[in-house]
Regions:
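Conserved glycine(s) of the Walker
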Residues: 154
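ATP-dependent helicase/translocase motor core
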Residues: 2-148, 157-169, 186, 194, ...
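Conserved RecA-like ASCE ATPase "motif II neighborhood" in helicase/translocase motors
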Residues: 216-259, 266-274
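Switch/connector loops and helix/strand junctions flanking conserved nucleotide-binding motifs
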Residues: 181-183, 243-244, 293-298
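Conserved helix-turn-beta segment of the N-terminal RecA-like "Helicase ATP-binding" lobe
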Residues: 179-218
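A short beta-strand-to-loop transition that corresponds to the Sensor-1 phosphate-sensing loop
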Residues: 177, 236-240, 263, 287-291
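Post-DEXD/H (motif II) to motif III coupling segment of the RecA-like Helicase ATP-binding lobe
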Residues: 258, 266-309
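P-loop (Walker A) phosphate-binding loop of NTP-binding proteins
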Residues: 150, 176
Length: 309
C-alpha cells in the first residue's frame, strides 16, 4: 500500500527568537484512490478528500484539505515522493488562538493514564507520581520545589503533563545548554507523546501550546515583553537571562506564573542563588536526575518527589 505524508500546519514568526504553534501534525494518507485533474489531484482516504494543487487559485472546492505543491501532482509523483509541498491553502485547523484560548482548550482534556503494558500505554509510575506531587504543590506553593527523576524515567513528559493538567498560565523553562534548549523547544511545541493517537493522554481537541524560544538578546524591554505575552511557554538558557539588562530581567521576573528549571544539578550554587533570588521562590520548580549538584552541593528547595532507582 502506497502512502504520502502531508506536511504539518503551523504558525511561526521570528528568526533568532522564534514563536511557534503547531496547529495540526503531519497526516499520512493512503494513495489507493486518487482523482487526477489538469491542475490538481484529489486523494480520497477514509471518505475524506485531500486536494493537492500546483495552482493556488484552482482546486477542489469540496475538499476540506487543500495543499499547494511546486507542480501539478499526479498519483505517480505522489508515490515517488517527487512533489515539494509549499503551504496549506485550506485546513480545518486553520485557527487564530491566543495564549488564553490555548489554556481554556486544556480544561478537562488531560487523562491520568497509568501505563499498563505496550498495548495500553500511558504515563509511567515515576511520571504519574511526580505529576500528582507537582499539581498538589502548585495548588498552594510557598517555596521552591524539587522533582528528582533519574535519567530515563521521562522528566520532559512530566513537565509537559504539568503544563496541561495544571493549566499553567505562562511558563518559563530554563536549561543549561543551547542543545538542550532546542530539544525542549521541539518537545514542548508537539507536547511529546501526550497527544499522539497511541497515548491519547491529552485529547485531540486540546490546542498545542504557543512556544517561544529565546536564543539572542532583545533590543529593549518592550520587545521582550511583547514576545513573552504571545506565548504559553518560553524556553531559554539561564545565561541569556543573566546577561540581560536589569530592565529586561525585571520583565522575565514579572511575566511568568511558573518557572521550570531543567537539569538543575548542572547549575553551580552561585549561579542558582543569583537566578533564584530574582524570582518569587514559590514559582520555581527544579527538575533533576539527582538531588546533588555537579559541584557536590545539595540542591535547595523542598523535594516534593524523589523516585528511587
Amino acid at each position: 500500500m502506497s502512502t504520502f505524508v502531508l506536511m504539518e500546519l503551523c504558525k511561526q514568526s521570528g528568526v533568532k527568537n522564534v514563536i511557534y504553534q503547531l496547529l495540526a501534525p503531519n497526516i499520512t494518507i493512503n494513495l489507493d484512490e486518487v482523482e487526477e485533474n489538469r491542475s490538481y489531484a484529489v486523494v480520497i482516504d477514509k471518505g475524506i478528500r485531500y486536494c493537492l494543487t500546483g495552482n493556488p487559485g484552482i482546486y477542489d472546492e469540496e475538499a476540506p484539505y487543500v495543499l499547494l505543491t511546486d507542480r501539478t501532482p499526479t498519483k505517480q509523483k505522489l508515490i515517488d515522493n517527487d512533489i515539494r509541498q509549499r503551504k496549506w491553502i485550506k485546513h480545518p485547523n486553520q485557527i487564530e488562538a491566543s495564549p488564553d484560548g490555548v489554556i481554556n482548550s486544556w480544561e478537562n482534556r488531560f487523562h491520568f493514564k497509568l501505563e499498563e503494558n505496550e498495548e495500553n500505554p500511558g504515563l509511567r509510575k515515576p511520571q504519574l507520581g511526580a505529576l500528582h506531587a507537582l499539581l498538589s504543590h502548585m495548588l498552594a506553593p510557598t517555596e521552591a520545589a524539587t522533582v528528582v527523576l533519574p535519567t530515563g524515567t521521562g522528566k520532559t513528559e512530566t513537565m509537559l503533563s504539568a503544563l496541561v493538567a495544571g493549566r499553567c498560565n505562562r511558563v518559563l523553562v530554563t536549561v543549561p545548554t543551547n542543545a538542550l534548549r532546542g530539544q525542549l523547544f521541539n518537545k514542548f511545541k508537539t507536547l511529546g507523546v501526550l497527544k499522539t493517537p497511541k497515548f491519547e493522554i491529552v485529547d485531540k481537541e486540546a490546542l498545542y501550546p504557543i512556544v517561544g524560544m529565546i536564543t539572542s538578546a532583545f533590543e529593549g524591554a518592550d520587545q521582550l515583553k511583547n514576545f513573552i505575552e504571545q506565548c504559553n511557554v518560553v524556553i531559554t538558557t539561564m545565561q541569556i537571562i543573566d546577561s540581560a539588562p536589569e530592565e529586561q530581567q525585571n520583565v522575565f521576573v514579572s511575566s511568568f506564573s511558573n518557572v521550570f528549571v531543567d537539569e538543575a544539578h548542572h547549575i553551580v550554587a552561585t549561579s542558582w542563588r543569583k537566578f533564584s533570588d530574582r524570582f518569587p521562590r514559590h514559582q520555581l520548580v527544579q527538575f533533576t536526575a539527582t538531588p546533588f549538584r555537579n559541584d557536590g552541593q545539595r540542591l535547595d528547595g523542598k523535594i516534593i518527589f524523589n523516585y528511587p532507582l
